Regions:
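Histidine-centered nuclease catalytic patch
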Residues: 139-171, 187-188
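Conserved aromatic-histidine-acidic binding/catalytic patches
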Residues: 45, 89-97, 128-131, 162-166
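Phospho-dense, intrinsically disordered low-complexity tracts enriched in Ser/Pro and acidic residues
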Residues: 2-20, 34, 155, 195-214
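Polybasic, low-complexity binding patches
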Residues: 163-169, 180-214
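General detector of N-terminal leader/presequence modules that precede the first folded domain
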Residues: 1-85
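Short Cys/His-rich Zn2+-coordinating modules
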Residues: 118-130, 153-161
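Charged, alpha-helical interface segments at or near domain boundaries
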Residues: 74-118
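Short cysteine-rich loop/turn motifs with clustered Cys
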Residues: 125-152, 177
Length: 214
């Protein structure tokens, strides 16, 4: 089960929380002795976040033909099931939940090939998660067209990309057009679009079929 609680004390080692609903029966029946804690920032969803959510919902609605309200409810439910969190309202959820939900909607668009009215770079509320998703789905971080992996550190002349360890290297997903622009303009390119390379972890290396030593 998922329960919400209020923090009532913390001394640096011991955290005391007060559940907002009675959970005694569940604790006794399941003999729970360990819990998972998810911290939120305490601030409510911003108007800008809400605009991003509804813009993404409208894009998905236009793509599949369902009403926006149905899409909002469906994606909210799927997000909560996937993340294992309580249902929430866009009227008063916290900013952390809104941020993660926006990232989920963006990933949904990438997974299903949903065409969007604007680049998802302008819709993201968490640039690092967005850049990771762009790499995972091979979508350009700038325009969202089909992309290749652009290494921030050059691999080097004469080196076989299939034989080097890519794990830990910084990379970004860019289409051919923006790949050329990145090579031509260098750091000015990244400053222009407010993007950057992220480190390839083992999961990304596996998804992208890049060699890793471990």
């Amino acid at each position: 089960m998922i329960a919400t609680a209020k923090i009532v004390g913390y001394d640096g080692e011991v955290l005391i929380v007060k559940p907002l609903a009675t959970i005694e029966q569940e604790l006794l029946q399941k003999q729970v002795d360990e819990i998972e804690i998810r911290l939120t920032d305490g601030r409510e969803i911003s108007a800008n976040q809400r605009r991003k959510v509804f813009a993404l919902v409208r894009d998905i609605s236009s793509w599949c033909g369902e009403e926006p309200e149905y899409i909002r409810k469906f994606t909210t439910f799927e997000y909560c099931i996937t993340k294992g969190v309580e249902t929430f309202s866009l009227s008063d959820c916290d900013m952390s939940t809104a941020r993660e939900y926006i990232s989920y909607l963006i990933d949904f668009c990438f997974r299903h090939g949903v065409p969007t009215r604007d680049t998802l770079l302008n819709r993201t509320d968490d640039i690092s998660v967005y850049l990771y998703s762009c790499l995972a789905h091979r979508r350009c971080a700038v325009c969202n067209k089909q992309a290749d992996v652009h290494h921030i550190q050059t691999v080097g002349m004469g080196r076989d990309r299939t034989k080097i360890n890519h794990s830990g290297m910084e990379a970004i997903a860019l289409c051919r057009e923006h790949h050329r622009e990145a090579h031509t303009r260098g750091q000015a390119f990244f400053d222009k679009y407010h993007i950057y390379g992220i480190k390839l972890d083992d999961n990304l290396c596996k998804i992208l079929n890049l060699r890793k030593d471990r």
